[in-house]
Amino acid sequence: LGDVSEASGARWVAQSVSPSPDRFGLFGAPPLSEGYVVLLGDERSKPSPPPSEFLLSVFRRNRAARLVCLSIVLSFVCSLLFWTASKNMGQTVTTPLSLTLEHWEDVQRIASNQSVDVKKRRWVTFCSAEWPTFGVGWPQDGTFNLDIILQVKSKVFSPGPHGHPDQVPYIVTWEAIAYEPPPWVKPFVSPKLSPSPTAPILPSGPSTQPPPRSALYPALTPSIKPRPSKPQVLSDNGGPLIDLLSEDPPPYGGQGLSSSDGDGDREEATSTSEIPAPSPIVSRLRGKRDPPAADSTTSRAFPLRLGGNGQLQYWPFSSSDLYNWKNNNPSFSEDPGKLTALIESVLTTHQPTWDDCQQLLGTLLTGEEKQRVLLEARKAVRGNDGRPTQLPNEVDAAFPLERPDWDYTTQRGRNHLVLYRQLLLAGLQNAGRSPTNLAKVKGITQGPNESPSAFLERLKEAYRRYTPYDPEDPGQETNVSMSFIWQSAPDIGRKLERLEDLKSKTLGDLVREAERIFNKRETPEEREERVRRETEEKEERRRAEEEQKEKERDRRRHREMSKLLATVVSGQRQDRQGGERRRPQLDKDQCAYCKEKGHWAKDCPKKPRGPRGPRPQTSLLTLDD
């Protein structure tokens, strides 16, 4: 310590240190020696500061030190933030259910395209609680696997008490999302595998595998060639079937068109069936069709459709169509006309088979309604003479109750189906007629804003439904016309009753006149203006009457006050006159007239005798005086 003059500090080294003022350490600090800070001083220097003050002085004097420290702090903060974000990202898991909830607006749009409506709470409940209990492998977080979705769908569409009709919109929407995934679903859907060529099958004994069964959607595994010994009308290139609402037997098969070219057609069908094609039913639901043939101008998706090889292919009704028809139309008992028109349109455009007709009736009608329709249809069967027949063999041949052996690929089978559809329509029309009830017809009245034409249609429908009469029959025109007049709106009915030569007017003339009256009705704005004007006029009349009554009361009060004042003034005058001339007191026998005694005034001889003159009139004062 003696080597260093005027040194201070806690610890020192026993080495000679040059007192040169030009020797500095890092950032202007004194030099370091063996890990110890040497604080130098001379006679002019003061004692060295403590270590804490020394470090702060270094930061204040040197910019590089500050930058280095700031960089270290920022690096530490960034590392901490990056580690926290990485940890959070690692803990967040995206599931199909959470993905659909994040894009709920897109899910609702897809559901709207399917003509259904979905709610978020029920969506979560069905996905996480209901469908996992079906035992088909549905996870609680949802899935976009079509195979699992279709198994859940088959459970939902199960007939009878085992079905879940309230879950139909939700599973249909899941199916739509999985079949045509939006951009936010595509990363979570595994791509479809392209079919790979299979090795030729070596000849062997009879195959023990069951014949190939068509699925609802294209399978991801390569399809197996069907055996050429068993041709199928429902070829694979026609598309797989969709699950039906009822467990009816599969469509009946038909023979080939001809035996000569049957083998060639089967070979073509076998070669083309190796490539899985999109389901025609799903294509029909999504509005995407296969490219049409060169000679076709429209795309038709009927149960019986002419295929590319000239053979009719069978496409059943989709469950979505059946669901929409059932829920968007009234029941047969409530409005048989509307449901009959719907079924007639379906029978005309879709050309259904016998199985399709049974499925359609079972979906849209109740059991009792279906039995009534079938009974009426069998009554409409006509014999060879053109009249209704009751022969069981002829009735069963035309309208069988059991599944017939009709081949729709032949002309004879198609003729049977055409006759069956015609009889079914006749049965629907006859079964829709209710017992005669004229009170129901009389209860049909025109609405306030209903046009006469619409009212006439409702009236005719009531005649068809509740009476045995046909409103289109000329013999019933008079009855329909009178009902039209009496049950029209009050303003229209009154004017129709006052028409000249009413008896010669036809129903068409009455409708045209009613339309003219209806169109001349005042608009709501005009009616509002008229009501406002009438209200103002009524208020003015009321005010005028009130003013007149008030004036009358004032005049009456004026007259009464005048009489009262006149009476008061007259009394005051009499009092004043009486005060000036007082009568003297009379004795008992003194005359009031002559003031003599011995007689009274009536016997006074001095009193003049003769007729009494008129009394002087008393003048009345008025308020003007």
UniProtKB/Swiss-Prot annotation:
InterPro entries assigned: G_retro_matrix, G_retro_matrix_sf, Gag_p12, Gag_P30, Retrov_capsid_N, Retroviral_Gag-Pol_poly, Retrovr_matrix, Znf_CCHC
Function: Plays a role in viral particle release. Presumably acts by facilitating the fission of the virion bud at the cell surface. May prevent the antiviral activity of murine APOBEC3.
Protein name, UniProt field: Glyco-Gag protein
Subcellular compartments: Host cell membrane
Source organism (scientific name): AKV murine leukemia virus (AKR (endogenous) murine leukemia virus)
Region (Disordered): 195-305, 522-625
Domain of life: Viruses
PTM annotation, UniProt: Glycosylated by host.
GO MF annotation list: nucleic acid binding; zinc ion binding
Coiled coil: none
Residue intervals passing through the bilayer: 67-86
Record's keyword annotation contains Glycosyltransferase: no
Annotated glycan sites: N113, N479
GO biological processes: virion assembly
Cellular component GO terms held in the UniProt record: host cell plasma membrane; membrane
Membrane topology: Single-pass membrane protein
Pfam family, one: Gag_p30
Listed PROSITE patterns: ZF_CCHC (PS50158)
Residues on Extracellular side: 87-625
Keywords: Glycoprotein, Host cell membrane, Host membrane, Membrane, Transmembrane, Transmembrane helix
Compositionally biased tracts (Basic and acidic residues): 522-553, 573-606
Residue spans, topological domain Cytoplasmic: 1-66
